[in-house]
Amino acid sequence: MANIVAIVGRPNVGKSTLFNRLVEERKAIMASESGTTRDRHYGYATWNGKNFTVVDTGGYVQGSSDIFEKSICEQAKIAIEEASVVLFMVDCQVGITAMDKEVAHILRAADKPVLLVANKADNVDTALMAHEFHALGLGNPYPISAASGTGTGDLLDQVTVYCQDTIEQETDIPKIAILGRPNVGKSSLLNALLGEERSIVTPIAGTTRDAIDTTYNLYGKNFILTDTAGIRKKSKVKEDIEFYSTLRALKALQDADVCIIMIDATLGLEGQDVNLISLAYKYKKGILLLVNKWDLIKKDNHTNAQFKKNIEQELGAHSHIPILFISALHKQRIFQAIEKALEVYTNKTQKISTAALNQTMLPVIERYPPPAVKGKYIKIKYVARLPTHTPVIAFFCNLPQYVQPPYKRYLENQLRKNFNLAGVPVQLVFRKK
């Protein structure tokens, strides 16, 4: 079950500030011209042992004041449909506005948890002013200061009440979600795979397809493919369609075993792509990167290798993710994409024995032991895979607190080199022995 927390409210109430506070990330994931914090509308958060995705609706509202108002109301409706819990933000220093009343009217009619967040309660006087928001009929307001973090702990305690427990479930049939930015070719790939016009590929709002799971068989292997390429009925504003599609995609990401993340070869890897990869990694999903529209790229003998090298450099720590070049339009390598995704699933669910880990990793550690810290030598005695669905490798040693990040990266690289872990998130833990 996906946990989606949507922040709604009129402009300038502090939605983005609260978003940054909850996901605890203040800088862009990729420092390039195409990827800045402007591209980041959703992020991973965890509290009280529960994981959830926070969506900042402010990132989807653009244009004139009339578009603002229409979009805000529309997004409130979408959030009601798709989110686990809605955070409705208001401004203590401004008080109740006509726009607040309009959004509150929509939210009151919803059969969905709504938490009224009274922001900018930076001192006792403004916190007392939060009581006026009782008039909105949405229960007790939560006075907070998103800027300083005051009150956000109590708010998060209540948010997690409405979130499902984070339990990794091992499934018999792999579930694969096709994700990516608008117009990268998700629908074209799905239609090419299925041989039918299952997803709507026109930009016309007024047609609808809900995200659905369907079981398929390829080369004798069953898998579930999640179709996230849907357009919401009656949506008239472009940003609303994007917001709706994003919520659906985020739910699909959380429910999937493997995420196929598609990018456009003519645009390359952009900030939103890296953010999506990072989110999938944090949720411990298998990942495959598809470079679509490869037919539009002028090529020579080195194009493929150079393009792949550039992407791997941009991915940094995620450079182990398999990359496949396809053309959904011309059906080039589309079935290889599913084969590769199933391969990632096999990598993710493989059972690595303790004996194999120790036979492989202890000689590696002996050749290059952990550097001493403060004159103290770290001795790793044995290695074991913990009984989790996604690989968690435990290193038992005398001084686990002194193992430094560069050495952890070295160990992860050696694990990936010696075991089939391409596209798989691997967690390393160090325990006292």
From Swiss-Prot:
User: Among its keywords, does the record have Repeat?
Assistant: yes
Q: Which Pfam families match?
A: KH_dom-like, MMR_HSR1
Query: What molecular function terms (GO) are annotated for this protein?
Result: GTP binding; ribosome binding
**Binding annotation for GTP 2:** 180-187, 227-231, 292-295
GO biological process: what's one of them?
A: ribosome biogenesis
Residue ranges constituting the EngA-type G domain according to the UniProt record? 3-167, 174-349
GTP-binding as a keyword of this entry, yes or no, is: yes
Q: Which residues does the annotation say bind GTP 1?
A: 9-16, 56-60, 119-122
Keywords linked to the UniProt accession: GTP-binding, Nucleotide-binding, Repeat, Ribosome biogenesis
Question: Domain KH-like: where?
Answer: 350-433
Q: Which SUPFAM superfamilies does this entry report, sorted A to Z?
A: P-loop containing nucleoside triphosphate hydrolases
CDD domains documented for this protein = EngA1 (cd01894), EngA2 (cd01895)
Q: How does it assemble?
A: Associates with the 50S ribosomal subunit.
Function according to Swiss-Prot or TrEMBL: GTPase that plays an essential role in the late steps of ribosome biogenesis.
Q: Which family does it belong to?
A: Belongs to the TRAFAC class TrmE-Era-EngA-EngB-Septin-like GTPase superfamily. EngA (Der) GTPase family.
Supply the name of the protein.
GTPase Der
Source organism per entry reads Amoebophilus asiaticus (strain 5a2)
